[in-house]
């Protein structure tokens, strides 16, 4: 989530997704601690009547706590049932992805705010280069994309809004055909020595049989700031990667910008 308004709106959508009869799964709305969780920010709050109209009353059908309808919820599952459960979990997640794309448009029509569904595309249509972000860093990144555009650099931004299930088809559609892209992760995947979202995106591109020169970035660990200077540095690295083939070594933004 980029800001507190998006958190509020997504939370409302999340209930409708989780309670849909074709999903029925727990859902997490994740956002940056302190940068958003402890920040005072003005938001527009829908009325209770508007929310009630958007969120139908939840009427459980599969599990009901009712002494007149006793049931046992399986405490131990054998292989056959577990396989069926996992299949249905996977199907429910894929349904959630489709539902988010649809609900985002419905929410936008009703409340005047929408966020692109599973991903948000910012100035990507004619971009040669794309920087991929997630969370609160996106605000400053959008500003720097605008600055790069003003300087004649055709840069766009792709913001990840959903991680599970991963919107691999949309990601590949946006990034395929670009001259280069970079992913700024606020995490580390030690097995790959890159960030987690970077590897998810590379897997999506591989599934689409599409290769685009790319750069993995890691920044902002432990709450360290990701500033305009860091994003400008990342954009320049992505553009420099254009003429090369293969992957770039992971760039630790906070260290490189400081000259460490």
What are these regions (language model features)?
Residues 125-153, 166-173:
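Redox- and metal-dependent alpha/beta enzyme cores, enriched for Fe-S-associated oxidoreductases
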Residues 26-120:
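Conformationally flexible catalytic loops at phosphate/diphosphate-handling active centers
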Residues 9-13, 38-45, 144, 170, ...:
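Short acidic, glycine/serine/threonine-rich loops at helix termini
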Residues 185-260:
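Peripheral docking tails and interdomain loops at the edges
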Residues 99-116, 133-141, 160-168:
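A general structural motif
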Residues 21-30, 113-122, 155-156, 211-216, ...:
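Flexible, glycine/charged-enriched surface loops at secondary-structure junctions
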Residues 1-33, 210-224:
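Conserved thiamine diphosphate
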């Amino acid at each position: 989530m980029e800001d507190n308004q998006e958190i509020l709106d997504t939370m409302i959508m999340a209930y409708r997704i989780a309670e849909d009869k074709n999903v029925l799964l727990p859902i997490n709305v994740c956002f940056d601690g302190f940068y958003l969780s402890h920040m005072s920010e003005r938001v527009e709050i829908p009325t209770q009547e508007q929310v009630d109209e958007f969120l139908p009353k939840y009427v459980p059908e599969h599990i009901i706590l009712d002494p007149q309808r006793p049931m046992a919820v399986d405490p131990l599952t054998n292989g056959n049932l577990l396989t069926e459960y996992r299949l249905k979990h996977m199907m429910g997640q894929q349904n959630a992805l489709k539902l988010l794309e649809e609900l985002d448009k419905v929410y936008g029509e009703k409340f005047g705010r929408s966020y692109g569904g599973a991903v948000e595309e910012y100035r990507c249509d004619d971009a040669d280069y794309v920087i991929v972000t997630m969370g609160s860093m996106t605000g400053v990144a959008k500003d720097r994309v605008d600055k790069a555009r003003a300087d004649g650099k055709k840069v766009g931004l792709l913001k990840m809004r959903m991680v599970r299930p991963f919107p691999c088809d949309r990601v590949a559609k946006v990034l395929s055909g670009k001259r280069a892209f970079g992913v700024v992760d606020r995490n580390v995947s030690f097995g790959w020595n890159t960030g987690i979202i970077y590897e998810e995106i590379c897997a999506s591109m591989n599934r689409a049989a599409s290769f685009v020169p790319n750069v993995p970035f890691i920044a902002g660990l432990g709450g360290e700031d990701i500033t305009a200077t860091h994003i400008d540095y990342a954009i320049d690295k992505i553009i420099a990667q254009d003429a090369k083939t293969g992957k770039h070594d992971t760039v630790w933004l906070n260290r490189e910008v400081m000259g460490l």
